[in-house]
Curated annotation (Swiss-Prot):
Signal peptide limits: none
Role: Auxillary component of the N-terminal acetyltransferase C (NatC) complex which catalyzes acetylation of N-terminal methionine residues. N-terminal acetylation protects proteins from ubiquitination and degradation by the N-end rule pathway. Involved in regulation of apoptosis and proliferation of smooth muscle cells.
Protein name: N-alpha-acetyltransferase 35, NatC auxiliary subunit
Encoding gene per record: NAA35
Localization per record: Cytoplasm
Annotated organism of origin: Macaca fascicularis
Length: 725
C-alpha cells in the first residue's frame, strides 16, 4: 500500500499499529498490489528493473524500512505506552511544570547530568539531553529552579558544541554536533542564565540555613531531610552555574580568563562530594517498558525524538549511571585544570610535549577542544598574545642556536638573510599548527594523521637544507670561523624523527601489530630511528656549544675580569639520555623476539594472500615520502638484520644474553636520571623484570617448551613485560 495524499498529519498517533493508523487518519490509501503484480509479469525470469531513481541506496532502504531490527521508527510500535512530547505531556498532566518537590528536582537534574555526559561521549543530542522534555522549551516551565537549570544545561550544550566545532579535532565516533532543530536558548543571554541560576542558588542557600540544626535543639527528622535535600539542589544548581561560567570564560580572548576558569574549577570540585552523597535523595525511574537502559521517569521520554533519527540509527544510547556521573565530572574537572596550565609554557617544544602527554590520557572531546582553542585563539595568535613565528624562532634558538638568530652575528641584520629566515619560519607555521592539532584528535585517528603530515615535514626539511646552504655561503664571507651548516635542517629532522617514532610506537598502544611483526618494528626503532634521533640531538647540542664558545670569546674581549666557570647543564642532555634508554629497550625487544623465533616460540600465520614483505611495506608505507632519513626497504632490512653475516651466527642463548644486557643498560641509564618522572618509572617496571627473564632464558629455562610467551603491556604502552607460560 502507498499513501497517496495526506490530509492530516497527526504526530500524536505515530506509535499506533498500521491498521489503527489507517482507521484513525484521514489519509487516502490506494491498494497497489494488483498493479505491482501485473507490472512484474512483464519481466522475464531473473530479470530486474533498474530505475535511475531506485539505486542501491533506495534498495537497501526498502529492505530496512519497517524491519524492527533495522528501522528505529518501528520501536514506537513495540511499547505499551503513548509517547508524548512536552506540550502533550503538560496537557495530559503527566509532567509537572510548577511546584516540583525537592526529590523530583534532584532526580531530574542528576539524570540530565548523565545525559549530558553521554552526549559528550559521542551519542546524539536527540537520544541524550533532549530526551528530557523540560529542555525542549524552558519557557513553559513555571518552577524557577527547573527553568534556570534547563536553560543552564542548554547553554552548556551550546557553548560546548561551539568549542568542539571550532577546535575541529573530533570525528564521527567522538562527537555528534547536530541539534535537530532544537532551540539552544539563543533568545536568552549567557549572563541572564547565570543570573537566574544564582537567584535559585541564593534561594536554596536561605532554605539550607533556615533548616540547619541549632545547638541544644532536638532535631526533627523531617526538617533534617528537607535540609539535606535543599543542600542537594543547591549543590547541583551551583555546579551547573560554575560549569557554565567556566565554558564562558574559555570563550574570552584574554589569558586572565584561564586563571578565572582555574579558580572556578576548584569550586566545582568542592561540590562533587555533596552531589555524590545526595544521589539517593533523587527520584528514580518508575518503570522500564522499553527494554533499554534509558531511565523512564517524570520529565523524560527516550522515544520522543525517534522520528528525528535516521532509519538505521542505533536503537538506544546507554545513559551512564548516576554513580559514574560524579566520577566522570571529577575527571573532567582535573582535565580542564590541566588545560589551564598550558598558558604557563613559553617554549614551542614544551607546548608540543604538553599536548603529547595530555593526549596520552585519552581525554574527552571537550577537554581536547578547550586545549586547542586555548592554545590558538581566534586571532591566530598563541594564547591570544604571541605570534606563532616568534614561537618557532624561540624554539630554533633553544634547540640549535642558529647564528642567523644571534644578535651578535653579521647575518642578524643582513636583509637578505632576514628574508630567508623569515620566509622559512612562515612556512613552518602551518605544519607545526597542524601537528599540534593532530595531538587533539583521538589516539586512533592521530596515528593516521601523523602518517600524512610526514609529507609536509619532508617538504619543510628540503627547504631547511636549502636555507642553511644559502645562509652558510653568506656567513663564510664575513665570519669564516662560524658555520651555518645543518642548523635549520637538524631542527626539522628532529621533529620528523619524533613523528616517525610516535607513528610506530602508537601501533603497540592501538594493538595493531601481531606478535610475529614485533621484531621488525623494534629493529626499525632501535637500529634506525633512535640512532638517527641521538645523532641529531648530539649535532644540535654541538651547534649550541659552538655558538656559546663564540659568544664567550666576544664577552672576553670586552671584559678583562675573570669569570668563574660554572658547570652548565646541557639543555638536551635529558632527552639524549631518554633516547638512549628507549633505544636499549627496543634493541632488547628485537633480540628477544629473534631468539623466541629461533626457539619456535613465535606463531607465524600461513601467508596465502600476503607475505612478510607485504606486511613490512604496509607498516612503513608513510615513511616513503621522507627523504631524510631514507626509508629502509624490506630487502635492506633482511640484509642488515641477517645473523649469518656473523661468524659463527649467534644462537638463541647468546641473543637472550645480549637482550638482557640491553635491558640492564636501559635500567642503569634510567636509575641515574635525577628527579625521575612517571615515564622513567614506567619503563623501569618493564626493564627490571625483562632483565631477569632474559637471564633465565639464557640459562636454558623452559628451553623445550614451544608455548608462546605472554606480552603484558599494562606497565607500559610500548614495551611489554615478557612472561613465560
Amino acid at each position: 500500500m502507498v499513501m497517496k495524499a495526506s490530509v492530516d498529519d497527526d504526530d500524536s498517533g505515530w506509535e499506533l499499529s498500521m491498521p489503527e493508523k489507517m482507521e484513525k487518519s484521514n489519509t487516502n490509501w490506494v491498494d497497489i498490489t494488483q498493479d505491482f503484480e501485473e507490472a512484474c509479469r512483464e519481466l522475464k525470469l531473473g530479470e530486474l528493473l533498474h530505475d535511475k531513481l531506485f539505486g542501491l541506496f533506495e534498495a537497501m532502504s526498502a529492505i530496512e524500512m519497517m524491519d524492527p531490527k533495522m528501522d528505529a521508527g518501528m520501536i514506537g510500535n513495540q511499547v505499551n505506552r503513548k509517547v508524548l512530547n512536552f506540550e502533550q505531556a503538560i496537557k495530559d498532566g503527566t509532567i509537572k511544570i510548577k511546584d516540583l518537590t525537592l526529590p523530583e528536582l534532584i532526580g531530574i537534574m542528576d539524570t540530565c547530568f548523565c545525559c549530558l555526559i553521554t552526549w559528550l561521549e559521542g551519542h546524539s543530542l536527540a537520544q541524550t539531553v533532549f530526551t528530557c522534555l523540560y529542555i525542549h522549551n524552558p519557557d513553559f516551565i513555571e518552577d524557577p529552579a527547573m527553568k534556570a537549570f534547563a536553560l543552564g544545561i542548554l547553554k552548556i550544550c551550546d557553548i560546548a558544541r561551539e568549542k568542539v566545532n571550532k577546535a575541529a579535532v573530533f570525528e564521527e565516533e567522538d562527537f555528534q554536533s547536530m541539534t535537530y532543530g532544537f532551540k539552544m536558548a539563543n533568545s536568552v543571554t549567557d549572563l541572564r542564565v547565570t543570573g537566574m541560576l544564582k537567584d535559585v542558588e541564593d534561594d536554596m542557600q536561605r532554605r539550607v540555613k533556615s533548616t540547619r540544626s541549632r545547638q541544644g535543639e532536638e532535631r526533627d527528622p523531617e526538617v533534617e531531610l528537607e535540609h539535606q535535600q535543599c543542600l542537594a539542589v543547591f549543590s547541583r544548581v551551583k555546579f551547573t552555574r560554575v560549569l557554565l561560567t567556566v565554558l564562558i570564560a574559555f570563550t574570552k580572548k584574554e589569558t586572565s580568563a584561564v586563571a578565572e576558569a582555574q579558580k572556578l574549577m576548584v569550586q566545582a570540585a568542592d561540590l562533587l562530594s555533596a552531589i555524590h552523597n545526595s544521589l539517593h535523595h533523587g527520584i528514580q525511574a518508575q518503570n522500564d517498558t522499553t527494554k533499554g537502559d534509558h531511565p523512564i521517569m517524570m520529565g523524560f521520554e527516550p522515544l520522543v525524538n525517534q522520528r528525528l533519527l535516521p532509519p538505521t540509527f542505533p536503537r538506544y544510547a546507554k545513559i551512564i549511571k548516576r554513580e559514574e556521573m560524579v566520577s566522570y565530572f571529577a575527571r573532567l574537572i582535573d582535565r580542564i585544570k590541566t588545560v589551564c596550565e598550558v598558558v604557563n609554557l613559553t617554549n614551542l617544544h614544551c607546548i608540543l610535549d604538553f599536548f603529547c602527554e595530555f593526549s596520552e590520557q585519552s581525554p574527552c572531546v571537550l577537554s581536547r577542544s578547550l586545549l586547542q582553542t586555548t592554545f590558538l585563539v581566534d586571532n591566530k595568535k598563541v594564547f591570544g598574545t604571541h605570534l606563532m613565528q616568534d614561537m618557532v624562532k624561540d624554539a630554533l634558538r633553544s634547540f640549535v642556536s642558529p647564528p642567523v638568530l644571534s644578535p651578535k652575528c653579521y647575518l642578524y641584520n643582513n636583509h637578505q638573510a632576514k628574508d630567508c629566515i623569515d620566509s622559512f619560519v612562515t612556512h613552518c607555521v602551518r605544519p607545526f599548527c597542524s601537528l599540534i592539532q593532530i595531538h587533539g584528535h583521538n589516539r586512533a585517528r592521530q596515528r593516521d594523521k601523523l602518517g600524512h603530515i610526514l609529507e609536509e615535514f619532508a617538504t619543510l626539511q628540503d627547504e631547511a637544507e636549502k636555507v642553511d646552504a644559502a645562509l652558510h655561503t653568506m656567513l663564510l664571507k664575513q665570519e669564516p670561523q662560524r658555520q651555518h651548516l645543518a642548523c635549520l635542517g637538524t631542527w626539522v629532522l628532529y621533529h620528523n624523527l619524533r613523528i616517525m617514532i610516535q607513528y610506530l610506537l602508537s601501533g603497540f598502544e592501538l594493538e595493531l601489530y601481531s606478535m610475529h611483526e614485533y621484531y621488525y618494528i623494534y629493529w626499525y626503532l632501535s637500529e634506525f630511528l633512535y640512532a638517527w634521533l641521538m645523532s641529531t640531538l648530539s649535532r644540535a647540542d654541538g651547534s649550541q656549544m659552538a655558538e656559546e664558545r663564540i659568544m664567550e670569546e666576544q664577552q672576553k674581549g670586552r671584559s678583562s675580569k675573570k669569570t668563574k666557570k660554572k658547570k652548565k647543564v646541557r639543555p638536551l642532555s635529558r632527552e639524549i639520555t631518554m633516547s638512549q634508554a628507549y633505544q636499549n629497550m627496543c634493541a632488547g625487544m628485537f633480540k628477544t623476539m629473534v631468539a623466541f623465533d629461533m626457539d619456535g616460540k613465535v606463531r607465524k600465520p600461513k601467508f596465502e594472500l600476503d607475505s612478510e614483505q607485504v606486511r613490512y611495506e604496509h607498516r612503513f608505507a608513510p615513511f616513503n615520502s621522507v627523504m631524510t632519513p631514507p626509508p629502509v626497504h624490506y630487502l635492506q632490512f633482511k640484509e642488515m638484520s641477517d645473523l649469518n653475516k656473523y661468524s659463527p651466527p649467534p644462537q638463541s642463548p647468546e641473543l637472550y644474553v645480549a637482550a638482557s644486557k640491553h635491558f640492564q643498560q636501559a635500567k642503569m641509564i634510567l636509575e641515574n636520571i635525577p628527579n625521575p618522572d612517571h615515564e622513567v618509572n614506567r619503563i623501569l617496571k618493564v626493564a627490571k623484570p625483562n632483565f631477569v627473564v632474559m637471564k633465565l632464558l639464557a640459562g636454558g629455562h623452559k628451553k623445550e617448551s614451544k608455548v608462546p610467551p605472554e606480552f603484558d603491556f599494562s606497565a607500559h604502552k610500548y614495551f611489554p613485560v615478557v612472561k613465560l607460560v
